[in-house]
């Protein structure tokens, strides 16, 4: 049972972190463009306008994805409460894989929004 609880907790980390980071990215983006913290891609670092837009868009997207992932993550895990450690491990691998794809996929959506809103020099269209 301890393994199930540990894996349950681990599976909840990504959606919860997405919710927390999403809130802070959209409401309190880093004040300056930097290479340490924040949504850092070539396009997002063109100027402060692209920087703020990227953080607001990504933050809102992560809030939606965090909520979207949280409920199924909980529901999927419930039937595994008395399963073997192997079954729980495989379930965790699949759930966290899906969550990881959601995080990476968010980059595609943010970059598309940046390219739709700004030209290649970071000037609004």
Model-flagged regions — what are they?
Residues 1-13, 72-86, 92-97:
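Long, highly hydrophobic alpha-helical transmembrane signal-anchor segments
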Residues 11-22, 66-73, 99-106, 110:
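Helical transmembrane-bundle signal
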Residues 42-63:
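Membrane interfacial helix-start motif at the N-side
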Residues 64-80, 123-125:
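Alpha-helical membrane-embedding segments
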Residues 85-125:
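Alpha-helical transmembrane segments and their immediate juxtamembrane interface regions
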